[in-house]
Amino acid sequence: MQKRELYEIADGKLVRKHRFCPRCGPGVFLAEHADRYSCGRCGYTEFKKAKKSKS
C-alpha cells in the first residue's frame, strides 16, 4: 500500500484514513486487521473491542 492511499480529500482538507502509531509517532501508520491494529515498524498492537451481542 502506498502512502498516498492512506489519505483522502474531504471538503478541501486532507484527512487520514488510518491512525498513527503512538510509539513511532507521525508518519508511521497502524495496519488495520479484523481484530487488531498493529505497527509494522515497532510491533505495537492494539486489540479491537469485541462487540457484545444482544441475547
Curated annotation (Swiss-Prot):
Belongs to the eukaryotic ribosomal protein eS31 family. This is Small ribosomal subunit protein eS31. The keyword Zinc applies. The gene is rps27ae. GO terms for biological process: translation. Its cofactor is Zn(2+). One of its GO terms (molecular function) is structural constituent of ribosome. Pfam families: Ribosomal_S27. Coiled coil: none annotated. It comes from the Archaea. Keywords: Metal-binding, Ribonucleoprotein, Ribosomal protein, Zinc, Zinc-finger. Zn(2+) binds at C21, C24, C39, C42. Part of the 30S ribosomal subunit. InterPro entries: Ribosomal_eS31, Ribosomal_eS31_arc, Ribosomal_zn-bd. A zinc finger (C4-type) spans 21-42. Binds 1 zinc ion per subunit. One of its GO terms (cellular component) is ribonucleoprotein complex.
